[in-house]
Every structure is written in C-alpha cells, then in structure tokens.
Amino acid sequence: MNIRPLHDRVIVERKEVESKSAGGIVLTGSAAEKSTRGVVLAVGKGRILENGTVLPLDVKVGDTVIFAEGYGTKTEKIDGKEVLVMSENDIMAIVE
C-alpha cells in the first residue's frame, strides 16, 4: 500500500475485536460495536506551527492506538483494504 499522509494526518487500520454479550453470545453486524483500536500504518511529517516550525508526531508506524471516531475520521479503501485517515488529535492513547 502506497499512501503518504500530509502534515499531522495518520493512517490507521482498525483492529476488529470479537464482540460478545454478557451471556457469551458472539454479536455480529449492527449488534456489535466497532473497535476504536487500530494499528498505525503511516504518519505525516508533523503539525506545522504558526511560526513555520514542524512539530513531529508522537505516534509512529506500528503503534497500536485508541482513537476517537467522529467528525474528523475518514474511512477510505486503499488496495482493497479499509483504512482510517485521521488527525493525530483524534488519537487518545498509545497502547504499550
């Protein structure tokens, strides 16, 4: 996959998790919630500050992250694979 995000954008592949009810039944389709965890596939060079300085991103390729899914998150299909394009601001944590 050749994709290069610009500035403070990050490309994330969602990690699907198996959803189970309290009784152990596997939930599918609309009953299952989408995961807000993913693996970083690509990162931009950084956020450009008002003075022109480039502030490097905290996340790096290979990091597992927890993200907020909302207005700023865009879903794209690249080479048949669904990925998320988001700003680093939409990433809430890095899982270590």
UniProtKB/Swiss-Prot annotation:
It holds the Pfam family Cpn10. It is found in: Cytoplasm. One of its GO terms (cellular component) is cytoplasm. The keyword Lyase does not apply. GO terms for biological process: chaperone cofactor-dependent protein refolding. SUPFAM superfamilies: GroES-like (SSF50129). It comes from the Bacteria. PROSITE patterns: CHAPERONINS_CPN10. Transmembrane segments: none annotated. InterPro entries: Chaperonin_GroES, Chaperonin_GroES_sf, Chaprnonin_Cpn10_CS, GroES-like_sf. Keywords: Chaperone, Cytoplasm. GO terms for molecular function: ATP binding; metal ion binding; protein folding chaperone; protein-folding chaperone binding; unfolded protein binding. Heptamer of 7 subunits arranged in a ring. Interacts with the chaperonin GroEL. HAMAP family: CH10. Together with the chaperonin GroEL, plays an essential role in assisting protein folding. The GroEL-GroES system forms a nano-cage that allows encapsulation of the non-native substrate proteins and provides a physical environment optimized to promote and accelerate protein folding. GroES binds to the apical surface of the GroEL ring, thereby capping the opening of the GroEL channel. Belongs to the GroES chaperonin family. This is Co-chaperonin GroES.
